[in-house]
Curated annotation (Swiss-Prot):
One of its GO terms (biological process) is protoporphyrinogen IX biosynthetic process. This is Oxygen-dependent coproporphyrinogen-III oxidase. It comes from Pseudomonas putida (strain GB-1). The lineage of its organism: Bacteria, Pseudomonadati, Pseudomonadota, Gammaproteobacteria, Pseudomonadales. Pathway: Porphyrin-containing compound metabolism; protoporphyrin-IX biosynthesis; protoporphyrinogen-IX from coproporphyrinogen-III (O2 route): step 1/1. It catalyses: coproporphyrinogen III + O2 + 2 H(+) = protoporphyrinogen IX + 2 CO2 + 2 H2O.
Length: 303
């Protein structure tokens, strides 16, 4: 490993530890179980899963560090000049599915890639972001989530949050449904527009912001009463989450195509989901308002 890779790895391992500790404290019941694994083709990771807690129904915070002789198609499709290069990929990825339908599902990811070829300069880039998927929308939560995202981006330029917010809205979109997965946040990839130290500082700012963005929302909503019908709606909307992850998500596709660990890759899927044929929310209901108002490409900080 290069000194750069070592620095990124040390940060990611520490980030995983800190996020797991914060989530365990907030849940107040369940604890993460660690499953360390080795990838036969090169590398390995620490999968940490939590479930059946007081707040968290299922969640995972995964660290992986894998390498190989050639980039898989999902990583080189939009940069064909990198095809055939050896690669190293490090990242922390997490998904939290709460019991309570009033607590949104959250996802975050920070990652680092190096693609190398003998006789040529190494190409590196960062990617990541975080996004929120509510089932029963709340403006206060949406504004808070995006405010934390904006504050994390602010030291790196006034244009950074708007660009990566818009990218998130485009990326987490279910084309076959014609709707976004959630209310967005930040998404970016192929980040090397600044020098390495600045890009690495940005990644740290995003990774460190996740807990500040998510836990206040959990604290506000975790004790909200809910009905069996609201729970059913949560499970129905979780189906959209599954559809996106299995059809569009680049991280899922990269992991499967690179021979990654299937259990860790599919950790992001919720434990209970339902699909109903041509199901429609009642007009004027909270369920209808989710798609009509909250699941829109909205400027939450400018309204």
């Amino acid at each position: 490993m290069t000194s750069r890779t070592e620095a990124v790895k040390a940060y990611l391992l520490d980030l995983q530890d800190r996020i797991c500790s914060a989530l365990e404290t907030e849940d107040g019941g369940a604890r993460f179980v660690e499953d360390a694994w080795v990838r036969e083709a090169g590398g390995g990771g620490r999968t940490r899963v939590i479930g059946d807690g007081k707040v968290i129904e299922k969640g995972g915070v995964n660290f992986s560090h894998v390498f190989g002789a050639g980039l898989p198609p999902s990583a080189s499709a939009h940069r064909p000049e990198l095809a055939g290069r050896g690669f190293e990929a490090l990242g922390v990825s997490l998904v939290i599915h709460p019991h309570n339908p009033h607590v949104p599902t959250s996802h975050a990811n920070v990652r680092f890639f190096i693609a190398e070829k003998e006789g040529e300069e190494a190409v590196w880039w960062f990617g990541g972001g975080f996004d929120l998927t509510p089932y029963y929308g709340n403006e206060e939560d949406c504004i808070h989530w995006h405010r934390v995202a904006e504050q994390a981006c602010a030291p790196f330029g006034a244009d950074v949050y708007p660009r990566y917010k818009a990218w998130c809205d485009r990326y987490f979109h279910l084309k076959h449904r014609g709707e976004p997965r959630g209310i967005g946040g930040l998404f970016f990839d192929d980040l090397n527009e600044w020098d390495f130290d600045t890009c690495f500082a940005f990644i740290r700012a995003i990774g460190d912001a996740y807990v500040n963005a998510y836990l206040p929302i959990v604290q506000r909503r975790k004790d909200t009463p809910y009905t069996p019908q609201q729970r059913e709606f949560q499970e129905y909307r979780r189906g959209r989450y599954v559809e996106f992850n299995l059809v569009y998500d680049r991280g899922t596709l990269f992991g499967l195509q690179s021979g990654g660990r299937t259990e860790s890759i599919l950790m992001s899927l919720p434990p209970q989901v339902r699909w109903g044929y041509d199901w429609k929310a009642a007009p004027g209901s909270e369920e209808a308002r989710l798609t009509e108002y909250f699941l829109q490409d909205r400027d939450w900080l400018g309204q």
